Curated annotation (Swiss-Prot):
The gene is rpl1. SUPFAM superfamilies: Ribosomal protein L1. This is Large ribosomal subunit protein uL1. It comes from Haloarcula marismortui (strain ATCC 43049 / DSM 3752 / JCM 8966 / VKM B-1809) (Halobacterium marismortui). Pfam families: Ribosomal_L1 (PF00687). Belongs to the universal ribosomal protein uL1 family. One of its GO terms (molecular function) is tRNA binding.
């Protein structure tokens, strides 16, 4: 269960958000400090499964063949085989569009080398190289897990953002999502919470409320 202060900040962000004619996301902004982000080992690059889900549609594309491809078609947004992967490698614009429109990629391990060859220069810089799928992994379970996953990625910037829910989720559920993210950062950063300057939560168009 999240700290009450986190839930209070979320409640204020939801209450103070102006009414819009679309469903807003709830986003978290994390400001880092005392880290040399020119050193890649100090950068944040984590996938976190949110206990209450993202509250949004998550686009997932799978690279697979045979039975795995057939099962993935039940739940993935798109499934591409080896031939389609090769075609994509020859169309830079299509590859970039796919990368920009997709939240997560999953791929059978046997295709990872070809993905690196054909799409590495497109997916790598975007932090979207596929999650490898072992032969005994259940592709449906992996996809369902990734639908509730967000990416924490700072790059060289001291401030990074990630979604933590949607405006029609409860403050308690959003706070639980934030709590999981902060715990992961505290565990992974060199000096834990001392490497976090400030944290804010806000809806898409609403005011930012300080969490920590």
């Amino acid at each position: 269960m999240a700290d009450q202060e986190i839930e209070n900040a979320v409640s204020r962000a939801l209450e103070d958000a102006p009414e819009r004619n679309f469903r807003e996301t709830v986003d978290l902004a994390v400001n880092l400090r005392d880290l040399d982000l020119n050193d890649p080992s100090n950068r944040v690059d984590e996938s976190v499964v949110l206990p209450a889900g993202t509250g949004q549609e998550t686009t997932i594309v799978v690279f697979a063949e045979g039975e795995t491809a057939l099962r993935a078609e039940e739940v993935a947004d798109d499934v591409l085989d080896e031939d389609e992967l090769e075609e994509l490698g020859g169309d830079d614009d299509a590859a970039k569009d796919l990368a920009d429109d997709t939240d997560f990629f999953i791929a059978e391990k046997g295709l990872m080398q070809d993905i690196g060859r054909y799409l590495g220069t497109v997916l790598g810089p975007r932090g979207k190289m596929p999650e490898p799928l072992d032969p005994d992994d259940d592709v449906v379970e992996v996809i369902e897990r990734m639908k509730n996953t967000v990416q924490l990625r700072s790059g060289e910037r001291r401030t990074f953002h990630t979604r933590v829910g949607a405006e029609d989720m409860s403050a308690e559920n959003i706070a639980d999502n934030i709590d999981v993210i902060l715990r992961r950062l505290h565990a992974d950063l060199e000096k834990g919470p001392l490497n976090i300057d400030t944290v804010y939560v806000k809806t898409t168009m609403g005011p930012a409320m300080e969490v920590a």
